[in-house]
Amino acid sequence: MDYYYCPSLLKLLRYLWNQLKQCFSRRAPEAKDTDTLVQEADSQYGTWADQHQNGGSFGPESPSPDSSAASVGKQPPGSHLSSYTESTSVEQRDSSRDRRSSSVDRSSSELESTDGPEGPPPSDVCPAQEDDFSFIHQTSVLDSSALKTRVQLSKRSRRRAPISHSLRRSQFSESESRSPLEEESHSTWMFKDSTEEKSPRRDESDEEPPRVERTPVSHPQRMPVFPGMDPAVLKAQLPKRSEVDSPGDSLSWTPQPKSPKSPFHPGVLGSRVLPPSTEKEERSEECSPQWLKELKSKKRQSLYENQA
């Protein structure tokens, strides 16, 4: 049935098929259960003797719908067919009227259902379909400012290389030299909004005063080596020592083998002398001859002259 392309013909065939089904499958309204028939009196239906007395009529005196089924069972086979055809013809006439009225209603409803896609859609469906897409106009543009700030913060919080010791010392000295007011101004950066645009004039004016204040940082205050001593007294004692040492330098220099010597002399390039042990020097002086001692003393004198 799905392969027909004419909807009106399809409806007509369906209507005829339904009528045929109802004709063959409908139960007779006069038929009743056997229990109810047994309870009823036999006088209503009559007996075989009564029927012979009445002139051979095989039906009851008062035709009623309830007694028709019993009379059909008692009639002979010849009259059974005639009575059945008469009853079915009457029933079909009555039922055909009801079916026509109901079929008109059904056909009109089926025409509306089958011709739905060809004809215009009903008025109730159109506004529902339009309202389905109304949420598109209500949506607002997404605010991506929060995502931008997250990206900026993640860039700032990336791991940096460790600061060298020289930078740490300079920062430490700068923090010591700063005044408490400057520290407060530097600490308030955490409470400022980084998204606010700063004017370039303010940045220049803010950068200039710290430059002037940071100039003395390059020359830190020198701590005294001897805190208990007066520096003026120490300076007065230094020239006295130089005067005492100067006459000794003018005299012939005498070697002092027991004094320890420095392992490296910066004046002589590439010359390194190990400090001789005192025990070896004493043994060498006792065992070595006079000419060897003079030779060693000359070498020492030449080394010190080159250094001077």
Swiss-Prot record:
Protein name as annotated: Uncharacterized protein KIAA1671
In-chain residues carrying the UniProt-annotated modification Phosphoserine: 62, 166, 205, 259, 262, 288
Polar residues composition-biased segments: 43-55, 80-90, 136-152
PANTHER family: RIKEN CDNA 2900026A02 GENE, TANKYRASE 1 BINDING PROTEIN
Keywords on record: Phosphoprotein
Location of region: Disordered: 43-289
InterPro entries in UniProt: Tankyrase-bd_C (IPR032764), TNKS1BP1-like (IPR040006)
Feature: compositional bias, Basic residues: 153-168
Top-level taxon of the source organism: Eukaryota
Basic and acidic residues: compositionally biased ranges: 91-109, 175-186, 193-216
Protein's organism: Mus musculus
Entry-linked Pfam families: Tankyrase_bdg_C (PF15327)
Residue ranges that the Swiss-Prot or TrEMBL entry lists as coiled coil: none
